[in-house]
Swiss-Prot record:
PROSITE patterns: G_TR_1 (PS00301), G_TR_2 (PS51722). Keywords: GTP-binding, Hydrolase, Membrane, Mitochondrion, Mitochondrion inner membrane, Nucleotide-binding, Protein biosynthesis, Transit peptide. GO terms for cellular component: mitochondrial inner membrane; mitochondrial matrix. This is Translation factor GUF1 homolog, mitochondrial. Residues 1-29 form a transit peptide. It catalyses: GTP + H2O = GDP + phosphate + H(+). Its main location: mitochondrion. One of its GO terms (molecular function) is mitochondrial ribosome binding. It comes from Phytophthora infestans (strain T30-4). Residues 54-238 form the tr-type G domain. The keyword Zinc does not apply. It comes from the Eukaryota. PANTHER family: TRANSLATION FACTOR GUF1, MITOCHONDRIAL, TRANSLATION FACTOR GUF1-RELATED. It is found in: Mitochondrion inner membrane.
Length: 656
């Protein structure tokens, strides 16, 4: 059977589909004319009430990072007439952020409504597509996108095969009882392993090989089969009642400079129109609906949204903090009519914390405004003002993961033009004091100096690593070095192995991913999920410069790593701190005891030479007075002077 499919692929490779032919699914809608980006909006708006729940399909594209989700989404948008060929070829249409296009990743989930006509029955269907991020840090975005869907396209790059995040998104979809359509992409690549990928899907995920779609978003091969499969194999919105009182699910939100918060919603029951007054089930707030519409993916205003449909509403919210993802909206006055909020509400929880300080103290207000603007579009970032003795005023920010932190840092520079100093990331620890009280510690400064009478709970994750069998030894060695415990080992058909380990979350955010890629020559992939915290011997290491503790450079680690990490940090700081006219002493302390020290020697001016001549001639008393005066001046300078620390000093902590 696989051999037959392989022969079919060869035929496709010889005669690839023409891009112009991709729009066939949209023909004959308007007296024989295909829909275009200018006509698709008016056509759908005029017939919006005709799209009952049974003629709607809500679906997501899920996959590992860089497996081609956004590229496939652009192809589908082109095939349905939402975007032109030129728009599709110029850039990935659903990736709007500069950081997304520079890194080639999706950070912010986007949505687009499409129109498709069934060639067999002639019926037209509304297809609502959600393009989701692929990196594990943004699994929160993936999960909230899945809450608005009844099915997913599980995308697998057949040149790379099933990866760690592929499995994670598949299981997330199955937990929600979503229907899955497997799709292989990049079949036109020279090193594509189509047969092996189909076998892996069949054995690992129990997928019928005959149901796997074969596509190439780059060349257009197989794209015409995707939307018909969505209509035939995915169910319509379930438990939707057009006659029931309004209930709609808040899926996402973003901030518009002119209109305020734009809410992406799925209407579950009833209908919503401009002028309606709505009530938030979790926020307990009331809002007036000013505008409703579809995302095509640009906003297109409509006279309402109906049961089963996904679109946007503008309700006069001034900030995305008023729009909690997963919230339920009722019509005002109906909250007392025994209506239940839709399940799945869960606030994003920060997993990594780091402090951000302006490079110039006078730029603090600019940094505050910049962070406020970015958090309007990313409600999963938390920011709290703090003060450091060494760096002045700044913000303690919480993120979903290390990549999330790096993306936020880059957006501050790209979009707001703000340069900041970022401290080493830290995960939240639970400290149990002698009275049994549980405290969550997010900064090294709040960590107890001595843990003799305290119990520390360390956050843990279950990490799934897919690696070629030849790299199993180095991967297990890395896991042991990071205090990981192996819990499972599964062999795949294509000489790859799934290794499951329980590992401290702090070890994962501290360069674990880069080291894994290095030892596996880039072949290993990583996915993780949070599990129960465990007791651990965690201590705080203080960094002192000229006897002063710098809270911004202190860090928390396991006791076994305190001495080597502290020594390494002192040595790195010695290399990045500029030499001064006075001696600089760099020390690392644990529990008040110094265990590592580095010295930066001062510049020495020869005070015994003036204008090329020796001062005092042969008078030794005069020379001793000059040397003693110089020594006293250097001691005074060391006492009152401040050592200037660059961003390199903080990144040396980050890469320890």
């Amino acid at each position: 059977m696989l051999a037959v499919r392989r022969r079919g692929l060869r035929v496709l490779a010889v005669a690839p589909l023409r891009v112009r032919g991709l729009a066939t699914t949209s023909t004959e809608f308007m007296e024989g004319e295909a829909l275009t980006p200018k006509t698709v909006g008016p056509y759908m708006s005029e017939r919006l009430e005709e799209f009952r729940p049974e003629r709607i399909r809500n679906f997501s594209i899920v996959a590992h990072i860089d497996h081609g989700k956004s590229t496939l989404a652009d192809r589908l948008l082109e095939s349905s007439g939402n975007i032109s060929r030129q728009e599709r070829e110029s850039a990935q249409f659903l990736d709007n952020l500069k950081v997304e296009r520079e890194r080639g990743i999706t950070v912010k989930a986007q949505t687009a409504s499409m129109l498709h006509r069934d060639s067999k029955t002639g019926e037209s269907f509304m297809l609502n597509l959600v393009d989701t991020p692929g990196h594990v840090d943004f699994s929160y975005e993936v999960n909230r996108s899945l809450s608005a869907c009844e099915g997913v396209l599980l995308l697998v790059d057949c040149s790379q095969g099933i990866q760690a995040q592929t499995l994670a998104t598949y299981y997330a979809a199955k937990e929600r009882n979503l229907h899955v359509v497997p799709v292989l992409t990049k079949i036109d690549m020279p090193h594509a392993e189509v047969d092996d990928s189909i076998l892996s899907l069949s054995s690992l995920l129990d997928v019928d090989p005959d149901e796997v779609l074969l596509t190439s978003a780059k060349s257009g091969d197989g794209i015409n089969d995707v939307l018909p499969a969505v209509v035939e194999r995915l169910p319509p919105p379930v438990e939707c009642d057009p006659a029931a009182p309004l209930r709609c699910l808040l899926v996402d939100s973003y901030y518009d400079d002119y209109r305020g918060t734009v809410c992406l919603v799925k209407v579950v029951d009833g209908a919503i129109s401009p002028g309606d007054k709505i009530y938030s089930a979790h926020q307990k707030t009331k809002h007036d609906v000013q505008e409703t519409g579809l995302l095509l993916p640009g906003r297109y205003k409509t006279k309402g949204l109906y049961a089963g449909q996904v679109g946007y509403i503008i309700a006069g919210m001034k900030s995305t903090t008023e729009a909690k993802v997963g919230d339920t909206f009722f019509r005002e006055g109906a909250a007392s009519a025994d209506l239940k909020a839709l399940p799945g509400f869960q606030e994003a929880r920060s997993m990594v914390f780091a402090s951000m300080y302006p490079t110039d103290d006078s730029s603090f207000d600019e940094l505050r405004v910049a962070i406020e603007k970015l958090t309007l579009n990313d409600a999963s970032v938390t920011a709290q003002q703090e003060t450091s003795g060494a760096l002045g005023m700044g913000f303690r920010c919480g993120f979903l993961g290390l990549l999330h932190m790096e993306v936020f840092h880059q957006r501050l520079s790209d979009e707001q033009g703000i340069q900041v100093m970022v401290t080493a990331p830290m995960v939240p620890y639970t400290v149990i004091d002698p009275n049994g009280e549980h405290l969550t510690v997010e900064t090294p400064g709040a960590f107890p100096e001595s843990t003799k009478y305290y119990e520390i709970l360390e956050p843990m994750v279950e990490a799934s690593i897919i690696t070629p069998a030849s790299y199993l030894g180095p991967v297990l060695a890395l896991a042991k070095e990071k205090r990981g415990v192996q819990t499972n080992l599964v062999y795949l058909e294509d000489e790859r192995i799934i290794v499951t380990i329980d590992v401290p979350w702090q070890e994962v955010v501290t360069n674990f991913y880069n080291e894994l890629k290095t030892i596996s020559s880039g072949y290993a992939t990583l996915n993780y999920r949070e599990i129960e915290p465990q007791k651990a011997d965690i201590v705080k290491v203080d960094l002192l410069i000229n006897g002063k503790v710098l809270d911004a450079l202190s860090f928390v680690c396991h006791r076994s790593r305190a001495t080597p990490d502290g020594r390494a940090l002192c040595q790195k700081l010695k290399r990045v701190i500029d030499r001064q006219q006075y001696e600089i002493s760099i020390q690392a302390a644990l529990g008040g005891k110094i265990f590592a020290k580095e010295r930066i020697a001062p510049y020495r001016k020869d005070v015994l030479i003036k204008s090329g001549k020796t001062v005092g001639g042969g008078d030794s008393t005069r020379k001793k007075k000059l040397l003693a005066k110089q020594k006293q001046g250097k001691r005074r300078m060391r006492t009152v002077a401040n050592v200037q620390l660059s961003q390199d000093a903080f990144w040396s902590v980050l890469s320890k």
